[in-house]
Swiss-Prot record:
Pfam family, one: Transferase
Membership in a protein family: Belongs to the plant acyltransferase family.
Protein name: Putrescine hydroxycinnamoyltransferase
UniProt keyword Electron transport present: no
Enzyme Commission code: 2.3.1.-
Region (Disordered): 213-234
Keywords: Acyltransferase, Transferase
Database matches in InterPro entries: CAT-like_dom_sf, Plant_Fungal_Acyltransferase
Gene3D superfamilies tied to this protein: Chloramphenicol acetyltransferase-like domain
Disulphide bond pairs: none
Function comment: Hydroxycinnamoyl transferase that catalyzes the transfer of an acyl from p-coumaryol-CoA to putrescine, to produce coumaroyl putrescine. Can use feruloyl-CoA, caffeoyl-CoA and sinapoyl-CoA as acyl donors. Seems to be able to transfer the acyl group from feruloyl-CoA to the acyl acceptors agmatine and spermidine.
Residues forming the catalytic site: H151 (proton acceptor), D398 (proton acceptor)
Length: 452
């Protein structure tokens, strides 16, 4: 697929004529911003013709950036490259226009592959903008929208809110129900308790002690840092392919019934699907030692747990870590894996989040030279990580021509890093994007749709 870039420009925030231009402001990063993945994430939408005009999309982008100013600012780093915050300087978002001489249906892949990297701005090198957008028009009139954002500025919950608001602005509607900008972090938002109460261990969970760092670099504004993306460029990394497993609503219902048999309250859709994929991956990987442990890293949203203000824009995620042995995963029924997942997520409760705030505010991180464990790797085996987008309103992005015909993550070939996404069919089915080694793919397919 040959993509021809037509233009690249900055789109700066626009403000109502009656409003005074806001002043430049520095927003310090919260402990949740600093502990998450410091990288660029990318997603891709496709819209059927007749699609919205570029002018309407650009106008909507300028309007929504005027409300979500964090996405129009620039990341600020310290002398060692550490994240300090975002300066709200109205630098703007990068907008790239491109075209493809062919039909979207004939050319664009249905699952992440190196080809889709051409449908969004590059994630390599220094990136001065928090947000980048690429609008790729196909000869058939279809439009692909590639969106990238710095994960250290906002999590998936916040980003999905931004995208829905962008669509509203492009249609000439109010960005949100209220005129006020969404709340973001400020120094008094996540205060430690007095006295602090660190009830749980956070060393070896959210933080680890790295080897001595190399010589630091000067602080800077803008630009990416460290382990940014992990998508492997145009060539597959280590023979890893991304398989798209489509679970129908009926299959999920039967899976939940099997997992929840004899249980008063059935396991959730997420718990059931993840338990099934965990067991399937364990089998496909050919892990032979029954005593070997496998762990999943699961994102847990802390907005309700910490009673964050409505519409909070930033990162507010920690992780649950269910663990089981290979022998238990393969030798015990599906309900065992689902229960392990359920219990681990339940332990990441309000008390755990408050303990983390107290620990992160105690000075131990700086004093002991601790670093976040949220660092991308090429291979996770025997472990897994899951990003669940099942409850985010990504499909509500509508620029005026209707909702997208498909939506998926970009190409991130980290073996074992799963994405769970509602199917574009809108019928309750779920798509799981599963990076596996090529030599394990057939084994995964053979047991993926088996209900034991």
């Amino acid at each position: 697929m040959e993509v021809k870039v037509l233009s690249s420009r900055l789109v700066r925030p626009s403000y109502p004529a009656s409003a005074a231009a806001p002043e430049e402001e520095f927003v310090p990063s919260s402990m949740f911003d600093k502990v998450t993945y410091d990288m660029q994430m990318a997603i891709i939408y496709a819209f059927r013709p007749p699609g919205p005009s570029v002018a309407d999309i650009e106008k909507g982008l300028a309007a929504v950036l005027g409300v979500y100013r964090l996405f129009a600012g620039q990341v600020v780093r310290g002398g060692g490259g550490e994240l300090r915050g975002v300066v709200l300087n109205d630098h703007g978002a990068r907008l790239v226009e491109a075209c493809v001489d062919g039909s979207l249906a004939d050319i664009a892949p249905a699952k992440p592959s190196p080809v889709v990297l051409r449908l969004h701005p590059s994630l390599e090198g220094e990136i001065e903008e928090v947000v980048q957008v690429q609008l790729t028009r196909f000869a058939c009139g279809s439009l692909a929208v590639g969106f990238t954002a710095n994960h250290a500025v906002a999590d998936g919950h916040a980003t999905s809110d931004f995208l829905v608001a962008w669509g509203r602005a492009a249609r000439g509607l109010a960005v949100a129900a209220t005129a006020a900008a969404p709340p973001h972090h400020h120094p008094g938002m996540f205060r430690p308790r007095d006295p602090p109460l660190v009830e749980f261990e956070h060393r070896g969970v959210e933080y680890y002690r790295p080897p001595p760092p190399a010589a630091g670099v000067d602080g800077d504004v803008g630009g990416d840092h460290k382990q940014q993306h992990g998508h492997g460029g145009e060539e597959a990394s280590h023979g890893i392919v991304i398989h798209k497993a489509h679970f129908t609503k009926d299959f999920i219902a039967r899976l939940r019934a099997a997992a929840s048999e004899g249980r008063g309250r059935p396991f959730s859709r997420f718990e059931t699907i993840l338990a099934h994929v965990w067991r399937t991956m364990t089998r496909a990987r050919g892990l032979g030692n029954p005593l070997q442990s496998s762990t999943i890293r699961i994102s847990v949203d802390g907005r309700q747990r910490l009673s964050a203000p409505a519409g909070y824009f930033g990162n507010l995620v920690l992780w649950a870590f269910p663990r089981a042995t290979v022998g238990d995963l393969l030798g015990r029924p599906l309900k065992h894996a689902a229960q392990v997942i359920h219990d681990a997520v339940a332990r990441a409760d309000a008390a755990y989040f408050r303990s983390f705030v107290d620990f992160a505010s105690s000075g131990a991180v700086e004093g002991e030279g601790l670093a976040p464990t949220a660092v991308l790797k090429d291979v996770l085996c025997p472990d897994l990580e899951v990003d669940s987008w099942l409850t985010f309103p990504f499909y509500e992005l509508d620029f005026g021509g209707g909702c997208p015909t498909y939506f998926m993550p970009s190409y991130f070939p980290t073996e074992g890093m799963l994405f769970l996404v509602p199917s574009y069919l809108g019928d309750g089915s779920v798509d799981a994007f599963v990076p596996v080694f090529d030599h394990n793919l057939e084994a995964f397919k053979q047991s993926c749709y088996s209900i034991e």
